[in-house]
């Protein structure tokens, strides 16, 4: 129904299902209302509606990162709020809540500037940013959240606030890394960088080369500069027409490269990797930065159900590689995908304006995505348990899933001191925990 709250869709109305369902449907739910907000005023009205009816509030743009069910909640879908504007002179962009990275790239590329986007151009930019944001320029420039200049959000009292380090230092600190626990962000101003091209793409190795490739990769990353970002995906591709023929229906080891220095230097750095086992497909090349989404070549719009887990690793030793190959390699028949991303570099450095993003001590992120089937989940958990000796004990919530919603799992994403501070900020701005349809940070029991 069209109301003072915008299009507040109820379960029996046309468009309700389309508005409530995201890309990853692991936490499918039936909200009391879905508000497809067209602007920030409708977001604020939706929060006031939730307050009036004493309902929790959730937010979704693309639905890549579900956490908990939004049953009986007010779910704000921001996909209509996709505005992007660029101030080339200041090297900044203003990004509305529902804009995807693809649209941001379309606006920044003509100015010779690049955002600190993620690997998929179809992910919502703001959701990525409030989770920290580990992208393909991160080893060079740091987490995307480190480069947020200002933001505008709706807090639990229904107020629209312009937030900077000067106006609300605690709130500004908490939102950059604290997800949507403190309010609904309707827009952000972020830094842009003078990166116009990348030497990047994928080396797709046959499954039988997995052990050789991973051992070589673990040594190779110890010597690369911060301009080099890389990751490795272990996956058994489906036998489908949209999968390139050399990769179709077989296990592959997909090594991704994104080098933001000179192409000749990138080619030199990648050469040892090209000398490894059978390469089925090589897409590494000099490319415009706007084509960065082709490097990981991730799925675009087909809905799926995946239980995602993430652990941060301090090292990738030979023993750790052997465990990954044994439990997730070509002979394991693992019913899940496994991805390693190289961290370090600027990720490890504190930002000029502090935020709560954790995991800065990690050398790698290990991500798994599994279908919700008991045996597959057990085998995935066995892999994660066997890697415990190399775990930092932390996690990255942008790579976490519906099984990581416990207080202990959320707390593991932050340092103990930062988590205590986050709970104090939560108690100040959302004492009733209205914003809890997420990886929840509960308010401190008392706050003064």
Curated annotation (Swiss-Prot):
User: Which parts pass through the membrane?
Assistant: none
Q: What induces it?
A: By mitomycin C in concentrations as low as 300 nM.
What family is this? Belongs to the oxygen-dependent FAD-linked oxidoreductase family.
**What keywords is this UniProt entry annotated with?**
Antibiotic resistance, FAD, Flavoprotein, Oxidoreductase
Q: Which organism is the protein's source?
A: Streptomyces lavendulae
Name of the protein this chain belongs to: Mitomycin radical oxidase
Indicate the enzyme's highest-level EC class: oxidoreductase
Cofactor entry: FAD
Q: Which SUPFAM superfamilies match?
A: FAD-binding/transporter-associated domain-like
Instruction: Provide the GO biological process annotations.
Output: response to antibiotic
Origin, by domain of life? Answer: Bacteria
Q: Which residues carry this modification: Pros-8alpha-FAD histidine?
A: 64
Domain spans labelled FAD-binding PCMH-type: 27-195
Give the matching Pfam families. BBE, FAD_binding_4
What the protein does comes down to:
Involved in mitomycin resistance; oxidizes reduced form of mitomycins.
Give the EC number: 1.5.3.-
Indicate whether Flavoprotein appears among the record's keywords: yes
Give the matching Gene3D superfamilies. 3.30.465.10, 3.40.462.20, Uridine Diphospho-n-acetylenolpyruvylglucosamine Reductase, domain 2
Gene it is expressed from: mcrA
Any one Gene Ontology MF annotation carried by this entry is: oxidoreductase activity
Disulphide bonds annotated for this chain are none
């Amino acid at each position: 129904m069209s109301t003072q709250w915008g299009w507040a869709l109820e379960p029996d109305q046309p468009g309700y299902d389309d508005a409530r369902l995201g890309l990853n449907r692991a936490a499918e739910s039936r909200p009391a209302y879905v508000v497809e907000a067209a602007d920030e005023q409708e977001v604020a009205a939706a929060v006031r509606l939730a307050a009036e009816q004493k309902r929790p509030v959730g937010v979704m743009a693309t639905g890549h990162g579900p956490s908990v069910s939004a049953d009986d909640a007010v779910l704000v879908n921001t996909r209509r709020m996709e505005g992007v504007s660029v101030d080339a002179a200041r090297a900044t962009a203003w990004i509305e809540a529902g804009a995807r990275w693809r649209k941001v790239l379309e606006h920044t590329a003509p100015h010779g500037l690049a955002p600190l986007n993620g690997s998929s151009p179809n992910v919502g930019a703001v959701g990525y940013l409030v989770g920290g944001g580990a992208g393909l320029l991160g080893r060079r420039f740091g987490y995307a959240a480190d480069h947020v200049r200002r933001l505008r959000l709706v807090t639990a009292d229904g107020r629209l606030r312009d937030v900077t380090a000067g106006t609300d230092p605690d709130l500004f600190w908490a939102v950059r890394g604290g997800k949507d626990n403190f309010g609904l962000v309707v827009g952000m101003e972020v830094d842009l960088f003078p990166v116009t091209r990348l030497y990047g793409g994928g080396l797709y190795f046959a499954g039988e080369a997995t052990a050789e490739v991973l051992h070589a990769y673990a040594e190779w990353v110890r010597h690369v500069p911060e301009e080099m970002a890389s990751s490795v995906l272990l996956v058994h591709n489906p036998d489908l027409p949209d999968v390139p023929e050399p990769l179709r229906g077989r296990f592959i080891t997909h090594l991704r490269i994104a080098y933001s220095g000179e192409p000749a230097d990138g080619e030199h750095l990648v050469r040892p990797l090209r000398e490894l086992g059978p390469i089925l497909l090589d897409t590494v090349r000099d490319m415009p930065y706007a084509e960065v989404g082709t490097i990981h070549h991730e799925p675009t719009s087909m809905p799926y159900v995946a239980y995602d887990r993430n652990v941060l690793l301090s090292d990738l030793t030979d023993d750790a590689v052997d465990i990954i190959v044994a439990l997730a390699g070509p002979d394991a028949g693992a019913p899940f995908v496994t991805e390693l991303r190289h961290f370090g570099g600027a990720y490890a450095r504190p930002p000029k304006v502090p935020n709560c993003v954790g995991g800065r001590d990690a050398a790698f992120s290990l991500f798994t995505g599994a279908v919700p089937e008991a045996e597959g989940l057990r085998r995935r958990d066995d892999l994660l348990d066997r890697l415990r000796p190399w775990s930092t004990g932390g996690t990255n919530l942008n790579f976490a899933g519906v099984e990581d919603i416990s207080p202990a799992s959320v707390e593991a994403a932050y340092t103990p001191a930062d988590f205590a501070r986050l709970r104090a900020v939560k108690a100040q701005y959302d004492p009733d925990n209205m914003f809890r349809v997420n990886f929840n940070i509960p308010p401190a029991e008392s706050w003064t």
